[in-house]
Structure formats: C-alpha cells, structure tokens
C-alpha cells in the first residue's frame, strides 16, 4: 500500500497499531487515513469511532481496509463514519482511485469553505473602508430594536455618518 501511494507522489506515514495511530493523528492530522479493521491492540472500528469523535468526515477522510468482504462489514464501517471501504486483497488501481477521490473531495470542500468565507466578507463589508455595510447595520439594528421593544435588550444608540464623495477622498489619499 505504502509503496503504491508513494509512487504516485503521496507522502505516507505508517503505523502498525492503534495506539501509535492515535498518537500520530494527535501530533499531526493527516489528509487521509487508510485504517485496517484488524489491528494488534485496538479494534479498527473502535479506532474509527475515536477519530470521528475528534474529526468530521469532511476534515479527515478515513478509508477502512478489511479482509471481510461482505455487505454487513462495509455497511458497519460506513455507518460508523468511514469515508469508504476497501476489501483485501487490495487492488492498487482501486486503492489509488479511492484515495485520490477522497483527497480531491476534501480539498474541494476546503476550497469551497474559503470561498464562502470570502463571499461573506464581501457581502457584509464595504470594500473601501472595510467596515460593515448598510445591510449588516440595518439587520443588527432591527434585531436590537426588536429586543429592546420586547423588554429583553438593553438601550442602544445608532449613529449614521455619510461622507459625500468618499470614494474621491479615498482614491486621492
């Protein structure tokens, strides 16, 4: 497995038991885990549960590997949070395809999240000043007003300043 993945430019860290796997993931979270169901010290399914308690499937894809090649084993792994399942003996082509697909999905989700954050910033701030735009001010003002009228909120004040031809001032200075 390691050789096949390394040949395709993927860096691999190999551990041979669950205890060291936990330590390795805790010290540096990998982009992808290939996890055998049968380990010398901890059941791979229990280890999967521990990883899922700390990392979502979006942030840490885990492909389970097992000699059990039946529907129930596959379903159990997926139900516990595995991203995918590979039966032994491993087929190198399928291994690479599933590893690449899992990594691409993770990277696309991360890129989409960054774009959403950037879009949110653009939608809520003025590009010239970097302060909140009118929509945000009106939304927050409306919420504060509603809270105040319901008796739940505190007193509030709102100051609106409008500078004519601000873009010209900003471009000049």
Model-predicted regions and their roles:
Residues 1-13:
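Two-component/phosphorelay signaling modules centered on CheY-like receiver
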Residues 17-20, 43-46, 69:
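Acidic catalytic/metal-coordinating carboxylates
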Residues 23, 45-58:
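Short amphipathic alpha-helix used as the core "switch/output" element in two-component signaling
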Residues 28-34, 39:
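Active-site beta3 strand of CheY-like receiver
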Residues 89-99:
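C-terminal output helix
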Residues 120-140, 161-173:
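Conserved nucleotide-binding and Mg2+-coordinating catalytic segments in signaling enzymes
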């Amino acid at each position: 497995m390691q050789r096949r993945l390394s040949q395709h430019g993927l860096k691999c860290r190999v551990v041979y038991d669950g205890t060291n796997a936990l330590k390795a993931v805790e010290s540096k979270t990998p982009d992808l885990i290939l996890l055998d169901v049968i380990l010398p010290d901890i059941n791979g399914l229990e280890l999967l549960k521990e990883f899922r308690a700390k990392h979502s499937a979006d942030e840490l894809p885990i492909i389970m590997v097992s000699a059990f090649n039946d529907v129930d084993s596959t379903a159990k792994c997926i139900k516990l949070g595995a991203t995918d399942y590979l039966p032994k003996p491993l087929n190198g082509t399928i291994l690479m395809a599933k590893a690449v697909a899992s990594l691409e999905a993770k990277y696309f989700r991360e890129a989409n999240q960054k774009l959403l954050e950037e879009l949110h910033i653009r939608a809520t701030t003025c590009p010239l000043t970097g302060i909140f735009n009118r929509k945000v001010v009106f939304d927050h003002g409306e919420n504060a007003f509603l809270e105040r009228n319901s008796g739940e909120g505190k007193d509030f004040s709102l100051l609106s300043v409008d500078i004519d031809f601000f873009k010209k001032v900003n471009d000049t200075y």
